[in-house]
Amino acid sequence: DGLRVDAVASMLYLDYGKNDGQWVPNKFGGNKNLEAVEFFKHINTLILGRNHGTVMIAEESTAWPKVTGKVEEDGLNFSYKWNMGWMNDFLDYMKLDPYFRRDNHHKMTFAMSYNESEKYILVLSHDEVVHLKCSMLNKMPGLEGDKFKNLMAGYAFMMGHCGKKLLFMGQEFAQKQEWSEERELDWYLLENPEHKKIQNWVKELLHLYRRNRCLYELDSMQTMQTEASSALSERARMARIICSLSSISHR
């Protein structure tokens, strides 16, 4: 199906994680790893050219330009770029008690300021549910019932945001424990109505996404309003969808 290439920045920069005297500049005197650049261009062109539907995803944490740009435009030709900025802002926001979110809506809208720079994929990955970072469910604030509701709201926002979507296994039914390669997922949780509800919610969101082409065709959206107490966004495509993140009912 494809590859997610980890730590791309460490390959693109000769001085990545190194001090002065620990690296040698390229032939132009710069810090770009020219061989790595050509390797990515070649391998992405080769794989994407041979296999229709295959994706190549770059986990790249810097502002390197045209990660998903075409080779003819001096891009690296990846299918998508891992949107780490969105992920960090999203998780920081969702961890907050709803009372304090009104002053932090910028965390949910900032990704739109750079959305057009690359083809992004929104990811809640294995990296975020290991090493005492807690499962997605246990990142949510409040009592257990509140955690489920917050997680449902977060997934809905993610599905309506620009960019392709990717959940790590177990997140679709609110796995409680952190992920470990030494054990399987806690499938027995699906016998619990709340966990089954989350699974059905994710299924309905995916069906909604696939039924509405305006949610995925152009991946373009504009923020209409970012007041402290609300956040409204509009996806400007073949259809108009307005998302209101507020406790006030709108008609």
Question: Language-model segments: what does each one mean?
Answer:
Residues 193-219:
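Catalytic cores of secreted or luminal carbohydrate-active enzymes
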